[in-house]
Amino acid sequence: MRLIVTLVMIFGIVGCGPQPRVQTNVDSFTTLTPLSEKGSVFVVANPADLSGSIEFKSYKSKLEDQFLKQGYSRAQSSSSANFVVHLYYSIDDGQTITSTYSVPIWGQTSGGSASHSGTVYGGGGSASYSGTTYSAPTYGVVGSTTGTSVNTLFSRIVRIDMFELNEGVQGDKVFEAKAVSKGTCGSMSEVIDEIFTGVFQQFPNTRGLVEIPGEFNC
């Protein structure tokens, strides 16, 4: 699917400036309070058949690290955990975005040299003259042209669902979050840290657009 958008929209989505940033829209709900006990967490894959994936194991460790920063501990198994956290993640094949933008053309707007010539008439007859005058040139925008940029925009989605555990039995859900991020990086592993950081920026009540700076190899 091809879309025509302005360059301003592209920059608004993928970020610009000396350090790239990941923009993530976060929506979260919770029954946790500042007085809620922390306890230990164990992260599982959603769907479960991803649990053997090396990619999932990497994200599992990163997500557990985020909980550690919030005062939780890492459980070695679901049977010994106080909470189980279901992690879902996905990235699409990308959408082609064609952007158009205006490029100014710079040139001389005034000044420089000018040639003059003419004829002078008097009582004794006439005489021709010619000469050149000079003034300091000034420069500015004298026109514009249109440029085109083509990018592939990827949609990345992360869902986190946290449940109480009682002797290994799953109980009530206490936290849920959905994070949607769009950008030109098509590798989930390159942006997952920034997405997790965005979700936990005001844990457990992060909502709205969150921007996290990062370094990427996409």
What label would you give each PLM region?
Residues 16-33, 141, 145-218:
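C-terminal/domain-edge helix-coil "capping" segments
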Residues 41-44, 84-88, 159-161, 174-178:
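Soluble periplasmic/extracytoplasmic beta-strand elements of cell-envelope proteins
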Residues 16-70, 75, 80-83, 90-99, ...:
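A structural "domain/chain start" motif
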Residues 1-16:
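Sec-dependent bacterial lipoprotein signal peptides
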Residues 88-166:
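Surface-exposed short loop/turn segments
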